[in-house]
Each structure stands twice: as structure tokens, then as C-alpha cells.
Curated annotation (Swiss-Prot):
It comes from Enterobacter sp. (strain 638). The gene is hisF. This is Imidazole glycerol phosphate synthase subunit HisF. It comes from the Bacteria. GO terms for molecular function: imidazoleglycerol-phosphate synthase activity; lyase activity. Heterodimer of HisH and HisF.
Length: 258
């Protein structure tokens, strides 16, 4: 059995790490490199960096900090932000990233997933999915350009359909960003995770809602996710990664201890 992964998420805007609630009202957390170094030292299994306004601004992630992060950590990390071509991806990987993640650009050009997977291998290609539960329709819908609330829009895709589509096109991993739960620390949306797990054959990462160690346990035990991503509980030092992993191990979760 593969070990479950604990993944701190660092949302980047204007060269700094920020954090919002339900993808809105972002506050500055701190500088990118020191936070990355801290999480690696605490025992994170990997890191994910999202340049949250790159796609909506029509630009690619700032590669200068990617190289600086690669110099100070010895764990895998994934970078997302405005990657629209194999050339964009190649540059980010050449600066030291282990994976690249695409989200809004994949919705605009689904064939991009296949082009990237063919060139770099599926193990390198992560697709992020920003999913919102609509009370009016009772369905989960995929959103686009969520890094800028003034430009965020609901797409024509229902979440389960898009999950299946990106797998067909070559996604090697899926990060499910559950927008309703983001930043509120009330737990992951287990119902949605179970539905997605039923149709997801590639590694699946839960994102949005972690507030306690028990929330991580529930995601692993009840929804069988491969990794749990979180931000505010780590940024604000509500949960220590080493202590979290020790707790999960005592609960029978296969985890890499620090």
C-alpha cells in the first residue's frame, strides 16, 4: 500500500503566499521560500504552489521563485499558474518543479492535458478542479478563473463529468478543490469525495476544509483519497505536520513518519 500524503498548499499572489476563504478575501501569510522550507522541515510529503491570478491575468507563473524553492527543499513540489503550452511547462520543470498542475487552461483547451502528458509523462501532469456545490441545482459544478473573484465563472461542466474527461485525456493525478469548504475548517466534503473516488482511477487529492486532525483521518479512511491538501491550518500553525502524521499512524493510516 502506498503511503498517504500530507500536502501543504501555498497560494501565491504578487510574490507572496496568501490565503482566502472560499477563494475570496485573501490575506497575506508570508514569503514563499521560508514557508516552503518550514513545511519541508516539518515533514510534508510534497508542496503545491498555485499562482492564483496567473490564468485570469493571462500570464504564466513567475519562475524566479520556483528556482529558489528548489534550492531549499528536498521534497517533491508541484507548480500551477497560467500554463498553456508544453513550452510553459518545460520551463517550470527546468527550474526544479517535479510536477505541473493545470486548471483553468485545461478547461479552455482540454487537449492541453494530452499534449503535456505525451511530452512529459502522466506522472508529471496534475489537473486541479475547482468544484462548487450549487444549492439551486443540487449539483457540483466546475468553476474557472477562481483566483480572481471578479472573473470567476461557472463552466458547463459538472464535476463528475470533468473528472472522467481529464482522465481520458491523460491526467496523472487530480486535486479536487472543494470551494464551499475552502478556508472554513469544517472538514472535507466527504460525500463529494466519495462520489469522485468512485470514478477516479488516478491518484486523488482532497483540498478544502481541513480544520482538525480528525478531518484528515476521515478523508483517508472514509473517502480513500491518496493525499490531503491543506493551507490555513498549517499557515496559522493550528496543526503541526509531524504531530498530524503521528496521529494518523496511530489510527492505522499508512503514512511516512518524520
Amino acid at each position: 500500500m502506498l503511503a498517504k500524503r500530507i500536502i501543504p498548499c501555498l497560494d501565491v499572489r504578487d510574490g507572496q503566499v496568501v490565503k482566502g476563504v472560499q477563494f475570496r478575501n485573501h490575506e497575506i501569510i508570508g514569503d514563499i521560500v521560508p514557508l516552503a522550507k518550514r513545511y519541508a522541515e516539518e515533514g510534508a510529503d510534497e508542496l503545491v504552489f498555485y499562482d492564483i491570478t496567473a490564468s485570469s491575468d493571462g500570464r504564466v507563473v513567475d519562475k524566479s521563485w520556483v528556482a529558489r524553492v528548489a534550492e531549499v527543499i528536498d521534497i517533491p513540489f508541484c507548480v500551477a499558474g497560467g500554463i498553456k503550452s508544453a513550452e510553459d511547462a518545460a520551463k517550470i520543470l527546468s527550474f526544479g518543479a517535479d510536477k505541473i498542475s493545470i486548471n483553468s487552461p485545461a478547461l479552455a483547451d482540454p487537449e492541453l492535458i494530452t499534449r503535456l502528458a505525451d511530452r512529459f509523462g502522466v506522472q508529471c501532469i496534475v489537473v486541479g478542479i475547482d468544484t462548487w456545490f450549487d444549492d439551486a441545482t443540487g449539483k457540483y459544478h466546475v468553476n474557472q478563473y477562481t483566483g480572481d473573484e471578479s472573473r470567476t465563472r461557472v463552466t458547463q461542466w459538472e464535476t463528475l463529468d470533468w473528472v472522467q474527461e481529464v482522465q481520458k485525456r491523460g491526467a496523472g493525478e487530480i486535486v479536487l478543490n472543494m470551494m464551499n469548504q475552502d478556508g472554513v475548517r469544517n472538514g472535507y466534503d466527504l460525500e463529494q469525495l466519495k462520489k469522485v473516488r468512485a470514478v477516479c482511477r488516478v491518484p486523488m487529492i482532497a483540498s478544502g476544509g481541513a480544520g482538525t486532525m480528525e478531518h484528515f483521518l476521515e478523508a483517508f479512511r472514509d473517502a480513500d483519497v491518496d493525499g490531503a491538501l491543506a493551507a490555513s491550518v498549517f499557515h496559522k500553525q493550528i496543526i503541526n505536520i509531524g504531530e498530524l502524521k503521528t496521529y494518523l499512524a496511530t489510527q492505522g493510516v499508512e503514512i511516512r513518519l518524520c
